[in-house]
């Protein structure tokens, strides 16, 4: 799809050719108050009160999500006009805008319309800008058009008719909106990669497949890539990481990707993604029901790859390193057993009380490995605990950090990206739950505060740099009829990196 921006000051009576320009459809918003403004007011004037008559007749009441196509409207260059209900004007916030945009796209995608003029991004949205609206509309459209059918015997290869979207914005918003359109398309491409990797079955998306995906990404976007095999990891004394792969015939892969967009000596942001391509729980076997969804236990890794793809396409002036410890967690005669003690790369010994708490075992060695990059910040992303789902459900990702400044940046990014996160506690008192009689620490701390003690475990390996942990167990995929990977938290991570690149620190 092609996205472009065109300035148009409706309020000043300057439509800049939008009314007479040729297109398949122009999208216009109508509030529930039935008061016309902006593009709707101009079109009403150009059509001698047509919209006013339609509203008075009750054909369009402006209620949120309603749509109405008008055909061959006299005085309008577009062959169709799509009216979209916006709901209450004084409550037109980001959610209402998103709902309106999705309603418009659904209506348009049900037709053979190819080229559209989209005016909704010019509407006044509470606490949001026009460039935000452009990017949000692009992401909403790309989410609706995403499909995963490549594993079917007859994949759906049909192309959507909709190809070209022109966003109208006010003259002063044009520059920012053009950047937002570029970033929105790049972000959608990154999210699609993350979704694809998550939705692939685990007999396809193995640790080796993730490594090959990273290599292809490096080739396509001129990134630096290194993949460490098990012998190299043994030489680095990654005993914790390797303990998880002990039961699998699939070789573990330790993947390192580097994007160099900032100054050569500028400290990078390191993203560490949990890459368990299938998690049976190991000897501490999971229940059979729903185990198929454990192919999504690599969504942290997928989000790192998707974020790096988006960042590379955006050309952000920042250095980013992606680290992915990739394994399968399988039961077998060679698998790690409950009660085994392993030694991490840092040298700390870990009593493995539960082999289903494996994510932290691979992440801790990756977090130690990250020290060599002298990072400005490290963020790990993991489908780590079911306890986080109990605490936060499926709306907010869990954010853990002792660094208030870093946590604040991530929360700001989550709000800007509409990819919500909620800060969770990380008090030292929780560390007592990880005490072991036989090793330096245990890999679980009991049922109370399970997501917190998991983050506390990781914090023991992050003393060398500012660090945050995102638990995405509740947000990385959906179950039920809408089963599939969401692409989160790529928007949050990308926005964090956009903000870091913009403030100048990343180029120093």
UniProtKB/Swiss-Prot annotation:
Its cofactor is Mn(2+). GO terms for biological process: proteolysis. Keywords: Aminopeptidase, Cytoplasm, Hydrolase, Manganese, Metal-binding, Protease. GO terms for molecular function: manganese ion binding; metalloaminopeptidase activity. It is found in: Cytoplasm. Binds 2 manganese ions per subunit. It catalyses: Release of an N-terminal amino acid, Xaa-|-Yaa-, in which Xaa is preferably Leu, but may be other amino acids including Pro although not Arg or Lys, and Yaa may be Pro. Amino acid amides and methyl esters are also readily hydrolyzed, but rates on arylamides are exceedingly low; Release of an N-terminal amino acid, preferentially leucine, but not glutamic or aspartic acids. The keyword Ion transport does not apply. Mn(2+) 2 binds at residues 274, 279, 297, 358. The active site is at 286, 360. Its EC number is 3.4.11.1, 3.4.11.10. GO terms for cellular component: cytoplasm. It is an enzyme of class 3 (hydrolase). InterPro entries: Leucine_aapep/pepB (IPR011356), Macro_dom-like (IPR043472), Peptidase_M17_C (IPR000819), Peptidase_M17_leu_NH2_pept (IPR023042), Peptidase_M17_N (IPR008283). It comes from the Bacteria. Mn(2+) 1 binds at residues 279, 356, 358. Belongs to the peptidase M17 family. Presumably involved in the processing and regular turnover of intracellular proteins. Catalyzes the removal of unsubstituted N-terminal amino acids from various peptides. This is Probable cytosol aminopeptidase. It comes from Paraburkholderia xenovorans (strain LB400).
